[in-house]
Design a protein with these regions (language model features):
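Flexible, compositionally biased loop and terminal segments
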Residues: 1-203
Length: 203
């Protein structure tokens, strides 16, 4: 699986570039969940090394290419080096507009909701959807229009549970390391054929 993770990182670069070309504003990838710590240590170590390499490359190119890259998740469990790199990429991103790529690291949808509820309660704010959402890792971003689940799995795996309330879903058998631009095209075509009513009725 280690080789697959390395190819998967390249897939992310390719798909992110393609999203920019298509005019898509946000791309969020689930890189490492809160449950992934249960995997074999060598696999976890490989994933962390890949994340360090990717973030370092991003830091080296973000200012040149005006790219926004944000890390979503509980970063306190990461190594000090990774935490520093996350802080740097998030800081650089505040200077630019346009396409934004998000990487979910040590992220879990349930944990995110619990964290937001705690912060909302501590703030003393009124319990509204807007105030609650302001304490999510994705604060300031729109909810996803489309969630793509590759690899033949038909479940959310604790991903963006609050944000996906009215998202469209697309499931495909293609493994993430094999996911290509044509696979994204198929997902977008499927999405464009949907009738999104957001709980209302068709006019």
């Amino acid at each position: 699986r280690t080789a697959g993770h390395k190819v998967g990182a390249e897939t992310f670069r390719n798909i992110a570039t393609y999203c920019q070309e298509l005019g898509i504003q946000y791309l969020t990838i689930y890189a490492f969940s809160t449950e992934n710590w249960k995997r074999p240590k060598d696999e976890v170590d490989t994933l962390m090394t890949l994340l360090e390499q990717y973030l370092q490359e991003a830091i080296d190119t973000m200012e040149r290419d005006h790219i926004r890259l944000r890390v979503l998740g509980d970063t306190t469990a990461l190594s000090p080096r990774l935490q520093q790199m996350v802080a740097e990429t998030n800081a650089i991103s505040t200077h630019y507009q346009g396409f934004q790529a998000n990487i979910c690291i040590n992220y879990g949808g349930r944990a995110e909701i619990l964290r937001a509820a705690r912060l909302c309660a501590e703030s003393g704010e009124a319990w509204t959807e807007e105030n609650f959402a302001s304490h999510l890792y994705s604060a300031g971003m729109p909810d996803p229009d489309l969630i793509i689940r590759p690899s033949g799995e038909v479940r959310l795996s604790n991903f963006l549970l609050w944000q996906c309330a009215y998202s469209e879903f697309y499931f495909c058998d293609t493994l993430w390391p094999d996911f290509e631009r044509r696979d994204l095209d198929k997902a977008i075509i499927s999405y464009q054929s949907r009738d999104r009513r957001f709980g209302g009725v068709k006019g």
